[in-house]
């Protein structure tokens, strides 16, 4: 894998090369909604999961819990659970062979749990794209894992009590790519000096 960031250090000043692979990965990543059926390699999964563990967390607390699911029966169960809160048609995970779930403490226990888990998901999606995998952010995990069925599944995963679902990603080899990049909206950011 090519390094994602070029940093040149001179006289204790850091100069970043403004065209680098990290920025390219961020700008070219897209939500993939069609996957090839073959499973991703173990080392690819490990790279994506490890990238998630390096996401920033409030006060370095490392609250999120990451669960990767490749068992087809459990994926089918997750899909059925998600459909109960899904208004679309078809598989909410788009047939991906791997689902990565992120959990965190309840907001009453740790106020940054949703923020921390979201950063984990973002890191994993960018990492996936950087090694040629496709991913798509999937919602409704909070509702899914608040059910009795969801709580039983969290126990099966060996997770501690008191966690809530933050989100998940569908993960696999892309079967197709979005044809165009939507232009960024005008006035997306402001710089105040």
Predicted regions: what they are:
Residues 11-193:
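Acidic, surface-exposed loops and disordered segments
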Residues 7-9:
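N-terminal polybasic/positive-inside topogenic patches
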């Amino acid at each position: 894998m090519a390094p994602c960031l070029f940093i040149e250090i001179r006289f204790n000043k850091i100069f970043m090369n403004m065209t680098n692979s990290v920025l390219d990965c961020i700008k070219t990543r897209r939500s993939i909604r069609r996957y090839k059926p073959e499973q991703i390699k173990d080392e690819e999964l490990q790279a994506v999961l490890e990238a998630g563990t390096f996401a920033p967390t409030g006060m370095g607390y490392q609250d999120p819990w990451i669960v990767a699911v490749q068992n087809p029966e459990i994926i089918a169960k997750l899909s059925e659970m998600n459909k109960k809160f899904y208004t679309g048609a078809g598989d909410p995970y788009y047939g991906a062979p791997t689902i990565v779930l992120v959990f965190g403490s309840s907001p009453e226990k740790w106020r940054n749990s949703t923020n921390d888990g979201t950063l984990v998901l973002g890191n994993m999606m960018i990492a996936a794209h950087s090694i040629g995998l496709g991913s798509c952010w999937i919602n409704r995990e909070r509702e899914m894992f608040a059910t009795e069925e969801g709580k039983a599944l969290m126990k099966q995963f060996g997770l501690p009590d008191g966690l809530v679902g933050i989100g998940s990603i569908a993960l696999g080899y892309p079967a197709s790519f979005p044809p165009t990049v939507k232009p960024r909206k005008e006035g997306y950011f402001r710089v105040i000096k």
